[in-house]
């Protein structure tokens, strides 16, 4: 597949087949994704990959966080129990859940921003490389990634680590329709040399 076709045809996949991908193939994709740009070759990406029975316990931690943060609409115990069952089914229906994180270096300063950007570049490389091999992904990033209890629950430290994303990966059961993008003409401006002076916004 050509790169243009790969970028345009990739979809966020919500439903997966149960089949697991070959681990060597996955490792190969990660090794290629690591050619993402990253300043000073810090290679800040770190991954935890949840599979098999670890998916349920990871899913439980995610749902605990959703409840803590008030992200679920209901507070009724029976409805919460049903929601938990639904999430458990979802977490077990996806072969791999990949938690991307990084070590903090300057407590939210520009180095951390650079590293965060590099991890995002890695993730998109991975999504496209996976798509080329017929593997679907879903990039998720909710407030949970900032939840200090959740960060500890996954064995990390809010002081030392920043969570970047959870990405689901597996062979797609259903490929959603394309979501068209807006034409870029509205979102960009060409700046001519004559316009450079007096540009500072109020
Ligand atoms: C930072 C980030 C967070 C996202 N979070 C979610 C999410 O929580 N749930 C979800 O279904 N998709 C999530 N997505 C995927 C987007 O919804 C998806 O890319 C968008 O709808 C366009 O669809 P497409 O990827 O199929 O083109 C996220 C994507 C990014 C980059």
Which stretches of residues belong to each language-model region?
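Short, acidic Gly/Pro/Ser/Thr-rich loop/turn segments
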Residues: 37, 57, 105-107, 174-176, ...
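Short, well-ordered beta-strand micro-motif
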Residues: 49-51, 99, 168
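Structural motif
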Residues: 95-97, 164
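C-terminal helix-cap and adjacent tail motif
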Residues: 5-12, 162-202
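Small-aliphatic-rich amphipathic alpha-helix that forms the alpha element of a beta-alpha
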Residues: 33, 98, 104-152
